[in-house]
């Protein structure tokens, strides 16, 4: 089987958020992704819920994806790109989803949601519960290893996962690119089988890039190729296809939480 990766978290669309700031950088990011084994990536624009959200946000993402697809075809870059959002959590997230202002990864049941780094456990739990109360919505917690409450109490992830949430860690976190606390937390979550997938959270072509092959090597060395394939291809592929992903089965053999 040819090795390839699915990246569900990137900021590759130009000038829509703090990611790529021009078309040239977007093309460079696509070249890096395709050249290092990524077959498909999701264009997850930041959607800041502290600002008014409208259907214009979704339209800009869809138009950006269409533009990027045309450019990739013109440049002969073998990369599939799909629409998505990285949604900043808010107390009214449930109503915004119901109104159709927010959508999941490739319009699937899987909604990528992020929180302020200093968000307390109770607030995160409330937002996740609000999302899960909607039939067919599965929260995917973006980079939980970067949240202070998870760094201080990583066992909390176990309860969110067992409630039906998924988790996406950043490749750069367990490589130490964000700092020691993020690295230690990411590795503890990985060791406990509480990470659903790994993504790049790419923002540029030179610093936070869409390279996933180094993550594959490190995961393979630490856990075996089967685990690397699960986190970088199989689980993300189920998300973009809107297929069922049984998270309780993923953590089923953790009989006692190993982080104490």
Give, region by region, the residue ranges found by the protein language model.
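An N-terminally biased module of ancient metal coordination in phosphate/nucleic-acid-related enzymes
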Residues: 1-77
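Active-site neighborhood of phospho(di)ester-bond hydrolases with catalytic His/Asp-centered motifs
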Residues: 6-8, 42-44, 82-85, 140-142, ...
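Non-catalytic positions within long, well-ordered alpha-helices that form the structural scaffold/packing
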Residues: 34, 132, 190-191
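Short acidic/histidine-rich active-site segments
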Residues: 46, 194-210
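Active-site environment of divalent metal-dependent phosphoester hydrolases
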Residues: 48-51, 88-90, 146-150, 174-177, ...
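Extended substrate/RNA-proximal surfaces in nucleic-acid metabolism proteins
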Residues: 52-168, 246, 250-260
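Mid-to-C-terminal alpha-helical segments outside catalytic/metal-binding sites
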Residues: 212-260
């Amino acid at each position: 089987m040819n090795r390839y990766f699915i990246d569900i978290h990137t900021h590759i669309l130009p000038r829509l958020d703090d990611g790529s700031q021009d078309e040239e950088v977007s093309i460079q990011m696509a070249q890096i992704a395709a050249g290092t084994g990524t077959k498909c990536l999701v264009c997850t624009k930041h959607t800041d819920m502290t600002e008014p959200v409208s259907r214009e946000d979704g339209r800009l993402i869809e138009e950006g994806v269409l533009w990027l697809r045309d450019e990739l075809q013109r440049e002969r870059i073998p990369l599939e790109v799909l629409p998505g959002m990285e949604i900043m959590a808010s107390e009214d997230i449930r109503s915004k989803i119901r109104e159709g202002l927010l959508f999941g990864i490739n319009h699937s049941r899987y909604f990528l949601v992020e929180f302020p780094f200093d968000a307390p456990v109770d607030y995160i739990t409330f937002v996740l519960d609000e999302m899960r109360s909607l039939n067919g919505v599965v929260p995917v917690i973006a980079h939980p290893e970067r949240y202070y409450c998870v760094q201080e109490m990583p066992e909390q992830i176990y309860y969110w996962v067992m409630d039906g949430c998924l988790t996406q860690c950043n490749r750069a976190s367990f490589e130490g690119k964000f700092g020691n606390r993020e690295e230690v937390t990411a590795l503890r979550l990985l060791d406990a089988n509480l990470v659903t997938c790994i993504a790049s959270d790419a923002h540029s072509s030179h610093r936070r890039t869409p390279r996933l092959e180094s993550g594959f090597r490190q995961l393979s060395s630490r856990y075996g190729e089967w685990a690397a394939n699960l986190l970088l291809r199989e689980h993300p592929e189920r998300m973009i296809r809107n297929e069922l992903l049984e998270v309780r089965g993923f953590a089923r053999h953790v009989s006692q939480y190993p982080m104490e």
